[in-house]
Amino acid sequence: MISENIKYIGVNDHIIDLFEGQYIVPNGMAYNSYVIIDKKIAVMDSVDQKFTEEWLSNIEKTLHGKTPDYLVVHHMEPDHSANIVSFLNAYPNAFVVSSDKAFKMMAQFFGTDFADRRIVVKEGDTLNLGKHTLNFIAAPMVHWPEVILSYESNEKILFSADAFGKFGALDIAEDWACEARRYYIGIVGKYGTQVQALLKKATALDIKTICPLHGPVLTENLEYYLDLYNTWSSYTPEEEGVMIAYTSIYGNTKKAVMLLAEKLKENGCPKVVVNDLAREDMAEVVEDAFRYSKLVLATTTYNADIFPFMKEFIDHLTERNFQNRTVAFIENGSWAPTATKVMQAMLEKCKNLTLSENTVKILSALSYESEAQIDNLAKELCK
């Protein structure tokens, strides 16, 4: 229960193994839906198609014979919109409330834009339910173009769509920030400029509760969550520290990485994180890259290019607008090492990166010269 007249009617998904076909979710997912009970009744979003019957049952049990007047659709991704048709079949007198772009997407998903049962809203429009009034806020590209949020002005609740969401079902307790960060960086991270614009709108409101489409309802210390979103969306490092991402074929590059990590700690670096790109969850490593202030990329020259896992990792960074960090490089090659050159070229599109003065070149295995380069790099990164 959110309040006396606003109820939770969402579901937990412990069947899912990959969210959006790529993100590992060991603790499942929550698809959140809410209902506002007033003179007019508004259901806020639907849930994934696997849970049609459970969701409709939740509505029925919560309303005790009353029928909804509206289904408000904040976001058209199928994990939130899949049951629009099922809802309208169950409640033939109800209307769908959403943005113009959302109705165009409905025509694509369902073959109809519900022309005779729709209410199109835009920034600044309101929907009066009685004591409760929904004020609509445009949130394009957070993280789809049709997205709207709604602010209920009586109880000061922000229905935030995918913003402030996280991985994980609601029946498993876990720290919010870790899985919210991985969710944000992976799914919304590219759109920092748009999130910044939304935060300006949100901070102008008197918000007591945030109701996202994934993750727990947020009711306490909201400034903490808003501050984290400001940090993430402005591409500001969350913590001082060095994250080393590496690939290693026969173990020699790994030895160099471990030596660097040891030297960084000896030189007083506040935090050192080492990730093997071949074995760690890629989304977790991308999350770490955005979390810390400095990044070391260590890989081998491979087919006159770089090792595939490193290439994939850098692609994840660049497509999410990685910026405002210090980046250093370790390359390994037995006859024509070019990995540093390739990695630097891939990062050219990133804004405000500081490339380290020192780099490390390994010719097959560690040597006196490359160990000295590692020592110099550690000292530079710990300044």
Question: What annotation goes with each model-predicted range?
Answer:
Residues 40-42, 70, 132, 156-159, ...:
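Structural motif
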Residues 44-46, 68-76, 96-99, 158-162, ...:
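Active-site neighborhood of phospho(di)ester-bond hydrolases with catalytic His/Asp-centered motifs
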Residues 211-238:
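Short N-terminal or domain-adjacent regulatory/targeting segments
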Residues 1-4, 98-147, 191-199:
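Metallo-beta-lactamase
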